[in-house]
Structure formats: C-alpha cells, structure tokens
Amino acid sequence: MSMIRIAPELNLVMDPETGTITQERKDSIQYSMEPVFERVDKLDAIADDLVNSLSPSNPLLNSWPGRENTSYMAGFYGNTFYGVIIGLAFSGLLALVIYIASLMRGVV
C-alpha cells in the first residue's frame, strides 16, 4: 500500500486505492498488508487441503492430476484384504472348535 505525495511542502498525500487526499502525519505509520495477505491465502489453501483429505473423492494439494479417487480405491482394497484375513482366521478358529468338539463327542 503506497501513498502518492501530491505536495511534499504541504504534506499532502493521496491514497491510490480510495482516491482520498489527506495530510501526512508524522505520528502515524502505515504498513503494507500484502505479505500478510499472501501468507493467509497460502494457509487458507493448506486448511482447505486438510479438510479435503477427509473426503476420498477430493484431490489433495500436492497430488498429480487424475488421482481424485486414489484414497477411495486404497481404502476399498485395504479393507477387502483385512476382511478376508479376519474372515479366514475366524473360519479356521471355527473349524478347529468343531473338530475338537467332534473328538470330545466320542470321549464324553
């Protein structure tokens, strides 16, 4: 945010954004907020990416194009794998219990 000095001997300045002309004061300091706004925009993009990471269909900030459903497919295949493993373990345990019960049926 810069000021245009209209008449330096009278301390008159103009704000180019609003078009107002005012007297320059020595006791006030004016800072440019552009670097702050750039960082806030960058943090906003990162926050949006964090929220998008919760949805499997939205692309992530640093991912390649065309990989929108990668998280969905990885979750599907991962859960299918663990489901098969747990199902086989449960079936094996059930078969073992049935086998032991059949062995004990002749003894008892």
From Swiss-Prot:
Pathway(s) the chain acts in: One-carbon metabolism; methanogenesis from CO(2); methyl-coenzyme M from 5,10-methylene-5,6,7,8-tetrahydromethanopterin: step 2/2
A Pfam entry, by short name: MtrB
Catalytic reactions on record: 5-methyl-5,6,7,8-tetrahydromethanopterin + coenzyme M + 2 Na(+)(in) = 5,6,7,8-tetrahydromethanopterin + methyl-coenzyme M + 2 Na(+)(out)
Entry's transmembrane regions: 81-101
Keyword Methyltransferase tagged: yes
GO CC terms of this entry: plasma membrane
GO biological process, alphabetically ordered: methanogenesis, from carbon dioxide; methylation; one-carbon metabolic process
Major subcellular location class: membrane
Molecular functions (GO terms): tetrahydromethanopterin S-methyltransferase activity
UniProt KW keywords: Cell membrane, Membrane, Methanogenesis, Methyltransferase, One-carbon metabolism, Transferase, Translocase, Transmembrane, Transmembrane helix
Subunit: The complex is composed of 8 subunits; MtrA, MtrB, MtrC, MtrD, MtrE, MtrF, MtrG and MtrH.
Family in the record: Belongs to the MtrB family.
Function of the molecule: Part of a complex that catalyzes the formation of methyl-coenzyme M and tetrahydromethanopterin from coenzyme M and methyl-tetrahydromethanopterin. This is an energy-conserving, sodium-ion translocating step.
Protein's UniProt name: Tetrahydromethanopterin S-methyltransferase subunit B
Organism of derivation: Methanosarcina barkeri (strain Fusaro / DSM 804)
